[in-house]
Amino acid sequence: MIGICAQFTCQSGKNAEFEALLSEFVTKVKATEPGAVVYQLCKNEKNGDEYFMLELYANAEALAAHGKTDHMTALVGQIGAYLAAPPKLTQGPAVN
């Protein structure tokens, strides 16, 4: 298994649109990617403009397939309009 934590900082005042965009994306991932074992958007309770996506993939093939989906391509083209900074990604193998 491969885990990823993607951190996002949303532009102030664009939270509702950002959450709607990511919620639709998460729904598509869960519906079409069986190798995405966990895919969940979370919000920082101490800073309402910070979000993180918890991602867990069954294997490297599932992660590679995720990056090639139509919904990922669409998200990459749209998400920048809502971000205050580039996303930060942390990736690594599951320990247990």
Question: What residues fall within each predicted segment?
Answer:
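A general secondary-structure junction signal
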Residues: 40-43, 91-95
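An amphipathic, aromatic/His-enriched active-site/gating alpha helix that lines ligand/cofactor pockets
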Residues: 24-38, 56-90
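Short, well-ordered beta-strand segments in beta-rich or mixed alpha/beta enzyme
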Residues: 2-9, 38-67
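Non-catalytic surface loops within mature trypsin-like serine protease
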Residues: 10-12, 59, 93-96
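Absolute protein N-terminus
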Residues: 1-2, 96
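Short alpha-helical
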Residues: 13, 48, 70, 74
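N-terminal first-folded block
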Residues: 2-32, 37
